[in-house]
Amino acid sequence: MTGLFEKYQDKKEFIENRFNELKNRGLNDENLIFSLIEKEIKTNFIVPQKLKSEMYDKVNYMCRRYMDRIARFELDYDFIPDIDALKYALICIFESVPVFHSQFIDNHINPYWKVCDYHVDEILTVIETNDFLTSTDEFLLQGIPVTSNVQFKVALLINGRESKLCFRWNHMLVDGGDYKHFVNDLFKNYNEYVENKTMPLDFRKGSRSYKCVYDDFNESDKKKAKSQFAGVSPHDKHTLPFTEKGEGDNKFIARKSVPSAIFNKARETVKKYDGTVNDLIATAYIGAVYEICNLPEQEKVGISCAVDLRRYIKNINKTGYTNHTTFMPTIVENKGENIFDILKQVVECNKKNKEDKFMGLHGLPLLNIGYSTMVYAQAEIVVGLFYNNANLAISNVGKMDLDALSLSGHKPVGAAVAGAAKKKPCAMMTALTINGNLQLSICSVGNEEDKKILENFFDVLSEKIKELSEY
């Protein structure tokens, strides 16, 4: 500490207080503490006492009426990570992004985040288990109250020489797109520490505002983008045949893996129709809806598909970890004679969506007006009147970057993502690709019969992908 005192003589009190604070939070490597403090001094970074709640924070908070606000992710490894290195990396990213250790204060007028004290053991839990699936669900299906002092929870599950890292976090803070950035940055610092006992500490500290999506437009297009008031929700009323809501309903995750041999062949087929992986997944989902719900062949079906608005941000590192996801409708007019007729309609619909220069930006200005011109309690009621929660929806996180997710040279051997647990009749499916395999999941609130319904839905959906692979 003497070296820091000599270098920053006018910061002695700050250095002493910050050193003790970081030690009390579980950071026991003094050299790393000094590096973190010096970076804060050089960048004039001071941990605030409170932070502004952004528009998407409020939108996701409003959605607590029909979902638990928690997003989930799991990664499988064939070794045991260094627990201290993982703890230190977590502390460093939390210190750099104070909203991660904050409480959401709903004062009904203008909610905000109150930055809190914490210990790393409140973030990371290490669990010995002989049943990965049970332990995973026990951890992932828990909630995180907005009054919690930390908004990310991590579990390291250990079974012999294998391990699983499970993450659950408050969706008000971060969506799946920025979770990938978060975990990539976390692991980058973990790996550097394991190898060299240092960390680059290059975490994103920029704005979390939804308005970042407009920054790289020219002035003319920016004005037009900020005028896209009308929403584009599909307003489709179809639902899967869930049971009625009951007292015995609980949270659960239904999962399905489509093997690479089938998935890759289906991808090649879809390419011949000028389609994408998102088109493939949407086609199989819609085809399964027609079959499970026994819909007439001429019935129109529309689902909502997630759109990552980071497509409009040229340098994502200038922004903070946040939500930049909205939804666009994918609509087919009829079932057609086979799955390929659905595919053609999906590809055509999504091509038209992509021709829109402002795809995904529709409705954002209206949300902003709602939250910026009224006190929060009133805005929540008004926004809730026009905010549409789709019954049928898809969010594809995409292909996992195995190198970025490697720990000490060990690439993950498996991964899965699950969104918030939504109440019936919502069936929000999340997807990712790892090692060529397509991993699907739906997190829901229901009973055992509902879980069987979703598992059957996944079986039918997988058959639709297989049909696409047999072109």
Predicted regions: what they are:
Residues 299, 303-335:
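Acidic/histidine-rich catalytic neighborhood
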Residues 295-300, 388:
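Short helix-terminating capping/connector loops at secondary-structure junctions
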Residues 220-275:
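Flexible, P/S/T/G-rich "lid" or insertion loops adjacent to the active sites of thioester-utilizing
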Residues 1-209, 267, 271, 276-297, ...:
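Non-catalytic N-terminal regions of enzymes
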Residues 294, 316, 381-384, 418-419:
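Short proline/glycine-enriched turn/loop segments at secondary-structure junctions
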Residues 197-235:
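Secretion/export-associated helical scaffolds and adjacent low-complexity Pro/Gly/Ser/Thr-rich regions
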Residues 89-90, 255, 321-400, 405:
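Helical lid/core segments from catalytic subdomains that handle acyl or acyl-like groups
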Residues 310, 399, 445-447:
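Short, glycine-/Ser/Thr-/acidic-enriched flexible segments
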